[in-house]
Regions:
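Divalent cation-coordinating acidic motifs and surrounding scaffolds
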Residues: 1-239
Length: 239
């Protein structure tokens, strides 16, 4: 009887491994502060067609999608929690949440990207192909990550030494790469260019997996052929 139980147990493990091999995990991390309003309206129209295109190109994929909508530390202090949805196949649920977003808040120019990245590490990642997709027009906190005028700290970066209550963003990004999660970034504004250059440096320092698994695009269009091609190619390579 024990032998039969072990056979069933091993069979279940094999089935889960096979399922994970065909699974594709995509987590979208979106800045939902006031400055993102025009992009978010476009994003609402593009989100579902983007998923449909990925599913068309990878019909065998078990596509799981998660979502984090983040703002800034002062918004959290005011009780305005971030939107935080785990990886799921309930695309209608994600789509409804996205369509109900009303951008506001933000305070100073940088936003709490480090906090959003920390939340991303708690998602139920299981696929061989794991992608975190950051979309923002503002840099993270910290003087290393932007060239904003520091003579007006209250307006530019209230947390110039990063979040006093959380991890340094370098450590969080290293943790992301340590879980073999690919980082895709949509660069919407020149203010984020220095930050993305620093992310690339951190990525190269870790040397955890090939640099082709990190992807930056300067574009204001989420529903972009280049993005879809990159996701599909990565999935087919890692399946």
């Amino acid at each position: 009887m024990k032998e039969i139980h072990n056979i069933i147990k091993e069979g279940y493990k094999f089935m889960k491994l096979e399922e994970n091999k065909f699974r594709l995990d995509i987590l979208i991390i979106l800045d939902i502060t006031s400055s993102m309003e025009s992009f978010i309206e476009k994003f609402k129209e593009q989100f579902y067609p983007m998923l449909e295109n990925i599913r068309k190109e990878c019909p065998e994929a078990l596509l799981y999608v998660g979502f984090i909508g983040y703002k800034d530390l002062n918004d959290l202090e005011l009780g305005d929690d971030y939107i935080n949805v785990d990886l799921t196949t309930d695309y209608e649920k994600i789509n409804e949440i996205i369509n109900n977003i009303e951008p506001d808040g933000g305070g100073d120019i940088p936003e709490d990207i480090a906090g959003a990245f920390e939340l991303s590490l708690k998602k139920s990642w299981k696929a061989n192909t794991k992608i975190t997709f950051l979309i923002t027009d503002s840099p993270c906190h910290g003087k290393e990550y932007h060239d904003l005028d520091q003579n007006q700290k209250e307006e530019t970066d209230k947390y110039i030494d990063e979040n006093p209550n959380g991890k340094k963003i370098k450590d969080v990004i290293t943790d992301i790469f340590g879980k073999s999660i690919s980082l895709f970034c949509l660069n919407l504004h020149k203010n984020t260019s220095k930050m993305f250059d620093k992310f690339k440096e951190i990525y190269e320092e870790t040397k955890l997996f090939p640099s082709k698994n990190q992807f930056f695009i300067e574009n204001n269009n989420f529903y972009d052929k280049e993005i879809i091609t990159k996701i599909v190619d990565l999935y087919k390579k890692e399946k």
